[in-house]
Amino acid sequence: EACMSIFRRIFDGIHASREGSSAIKMFIKIREGFILNKVMSLHDAVAKYVENGDTLAIGGFTTNRKPYATVSEILRQGQKDFIVYAGPGGGEVDMLIGEGRVAAYINCYTANSGYTNVSRRFRAAIEQGKLTYEDYSQDVLMLMLHASSLGLPFLPVRLMQGSGLMKFWGISEEKRKTMPKIENLKCVEIENPMVPGQKVVAVPVPKIDTAIIHVQQASPDGTCIIMGDEFHDIDIAIAARKTIVTCEEIVSDEFIRRDPTKTRIFGECVQAVVKAPYGAWPAQCYDYYDDDDAGLKEYDKASKYQDAEDAVKQLEKAAAKAAKALEKAPEDEKLKLAAENAQKAFELAKSGEKIPETFKDFLEKWVYSCEDQSALLDKLGGSRLMRLKNEPHLGYSTTH
């Protein structure tokens, strides 16, 4: 108890500075790493470790091992004003953006690959000037997150030299001065101190408050097994001050020790462990279940429209566009049918008789009306979930 008291005082002093190397960051996390059982409910994990204004890093890759369960809980609880970093993001980031929870987004690519080339609420927010956004190449962003795990002050790269990414800034230098958690520069060309006359590009290194990650297996102390590609999840788990891990199943310490080579994230990096079966739904989780084709198609279709009012406006524009195309070729039967259908869809929506499913409808159906992950699974039903389940030793579903 006396030793713990000393450790607590030392670590509290370090934590107060919030600065320093990756070693110091790790020591901060070790204080909570002494806790051998970090299992808690998803509600409690989000309430305790996700705060308004956090710099949030999201694990996974487009439709792979995305922490949808945690994002859904964040939406239910109402935390907002996040600075979000994600490797290639997907619908989980799109949902946060569509609900207005993101103050700034630093990314390289956002899509539900194979379903939506560019996530629709993300795209609409940028086109309407509602989202503060910065764009890096995928390789540079991954290196930035890795540099964060190493505690580097900045990162020298050569990967963006000569590209438009150097010239075009989504967040101006002036605006950056008004956002304390955004670095003062997107990038700057500097001289390589090792090779006189050679130029390199210096990019900032994010300071991550909270990482949210979904894995296949985790032990109560937070030790994680990731099957398949790890993406940037290990880096953000190390870099973040707080890490929430959801998992398909909680395994024993003995299970972890049987094959320690499978360990990818150490318990010292994790503050909360949450059992959340199908926690990546509608995305896939390698060796457990495939992505839900029906769910991702539903989201793609619904996310075209923010809400009913937006649906009416967009359908009106579509009808006008179809009518204009018909004017140029009035004898074209295909254009005539398209114009008739577009006009009918607009009139039905305007009258309220038939409004297509919208983004808001999707969230009400699959997020807000579900008290928790168990309620979501009940709504999806066992038959649908079993069709997604991977066959042992194959790594994919044979019925989906």
Labelled PLM ranges:
Residues 5-327, 331, 336, 340-400:
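Conserved alpha/beta enzyme-core scaffold
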